[in-house]
């Protein structure tokens, strides 16, 4: 079925960004926001070629007149019509391929509802007529990308964070933990604490500005209390940011108060454990014999793991929780923003993987539920 000439397509549909490209490449060809925008106003000029919806970068550039919606929330697709638009845009506009000619590897968050992956499968075969497809777990792909078969992956994106322990290539489902606290919640929290400074951001378009501030200026403090004291005592931590209209705003302790939420979810009123404790709890749910290997191979992945200082802080927090003699190593590859995609590219180009694809024929015989039998 899968000749060498036909490259598989790898599509990592994140809650915030969609990463797409060809298996065997070392980086995704297309990276664009998972956004569908619809005009807020009535079009008055004829012949402008206005559309009733815009996807990705085009929606982002016209955000001033659009209402922006993310069809994926917390890693789960909540609006399938918009999701189809994003896939259509991925295949036809970004990659410029005919999906009926290529196997497609999709990714999903662990512990997702079964109906979610069935619907993904159905759309790929029925709407896009793909010859074959597969759904892989995001965190497992990140581990592949780091060149390991054993380790615990802390994957934190825009919509969901999860810890997935993997031993010799097997994910341990009983020990997977999921935390619905990720990049989008941090953006919302930053919007809130910037309001305390007197800067008001409210619309869906303004949220994107705040997301940019977060990505450019935020960092993780090694010692939160001490950093707060430093910020209060001097202006050494202050940075300025120019808004699209030329206004310049200054932010200080917000720079590290925002990502601190990952370690103290109580900041946004969540009762759950922080990412360090979640990682520790996940390791503790595993067999006592393999914990040592997990502590020594803790891999960070996803865009929300990109804050400067986060690896050192994780090292410090997990060292405090773990037995004192335990060797702890936090691996934070520089390309971790795309490591899920890179892992997918590696997986889909392995010769041993070629028999794993769900073919159109198998789908026609068994229906969407085939995905649970063939994809872990």
From Swiss-Prot:
Keyword field contains tRNA processing: no
Q: Which Enzyme Commission numbers does its entry carry? A: 3.6.4.-
**Catalytic activity annotation:** ATP + H2O = ADP + phosphate + H(+)
Propeptide residues according to the Swiss-Prot or TrEMBL record: 1-2
**SMART domains, per this entry?**
ACTIN (SM00268)
PANTHER family given in the database record: ACTIN
Q: Which domain of life is it from?
A: Eukaryota
GO CC terms for this protein?
cytoplasm; cytoskeleton
Gene3D superfamilies in alphabetical order: 3.30.420.40, Actin, Chain A, domain 4
Protein name in the entry? Actin, cytoskeletal
List, in alphabetical order, the Gene Ontology terms for molecular function in this entry. Answer: ATP binding; hydrolase activity
Q: Which CDD domains match?
A: ASKHA_NBD_actin
Question: What does it do?
Answer: Actins are highly conserved proteins that are involved in various types of cell motility and are ubiquitously expressed in all eukaryotic cells.
Q: Which organism is the protein's source?
A: Heliocidaris tuberculata
**InterPro entries linked:** Actin, Actin/actin-like_CS, Actin_CS, ATPase_NBD
């Amino acid at each position: 079925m899968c000749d060498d000439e036909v490259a598989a397509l790898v599509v990592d549909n994140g809650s915030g960004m969609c990463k797409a490209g060809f298996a065997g490449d070392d980086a995704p060809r297309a990276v664009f926001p998972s956004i569908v925008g619809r005009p807020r106003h009535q079009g008055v000029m004829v012949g402008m070629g206005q559309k009733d919806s815009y996807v990705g970068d085009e929606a982002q550039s016209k955000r001033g007149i659009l209402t922006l919606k993310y069809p994926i929330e917390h890693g789960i697709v909540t609006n399938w019509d918009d999701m189809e638009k994003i896939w259509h845009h991925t295949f036809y506009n970004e990659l410029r391929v005919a999906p009926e000619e290529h196997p497609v590897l999709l990714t999903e968050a662990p512990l997702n509802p079964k109906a979610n992956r069935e619907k993904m499968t159905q759309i790929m075969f029925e709407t896009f007529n793909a010859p074959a497809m597969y759904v892989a777990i995001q965190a497992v792909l990140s581990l592949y990308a780091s060149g390991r078969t054993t380790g615990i992956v802390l994957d934190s994106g825009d919509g969901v964070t999860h810890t997935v322990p993997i031993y010799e290539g097997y994910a341990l489902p009983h020990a997977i933990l999921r935390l619905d606290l990720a990049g989008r919640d941090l953006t919302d929290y930053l919007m809130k604490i910037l309001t305390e400074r007197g800067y008001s951001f409210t619309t869906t378009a303004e949220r994107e500005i705040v997301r940019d501030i977060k990505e450019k200026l935020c960092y993780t403090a090694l010692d939160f209390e001490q950093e707060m004291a430093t910020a209060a005592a001097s202006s050494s931590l202050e940075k300025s940011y120019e808004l699209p209209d030329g206004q310049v705003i200054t932010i200080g302790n917000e720079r590290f108060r925002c990502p601190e939420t990952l370690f103290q979810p109580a900041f946004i009123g969540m009762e759950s454990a922080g990412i360090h404790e979640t990682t520790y709890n996940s390791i503790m749910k595993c067999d006592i014999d393999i914990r040592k290997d997990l502590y020594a191979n803790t891999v960070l992945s996803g865009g929300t793991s990109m804050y400067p200082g986060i690896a050192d802080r994780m090292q410090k927090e997990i060292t405090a929780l773990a037995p004192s003699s335990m060797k702890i190593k936090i691996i934070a590859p520089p390309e971790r923003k795309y490591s899920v995609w890179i892992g997918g590219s590696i997986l889909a180009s392995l010769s041993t993987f070629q028999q794993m694809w769900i073919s159109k024929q198998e789908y026609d015989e068994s229906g969407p539920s085939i995905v649970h039998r063939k994809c872990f």
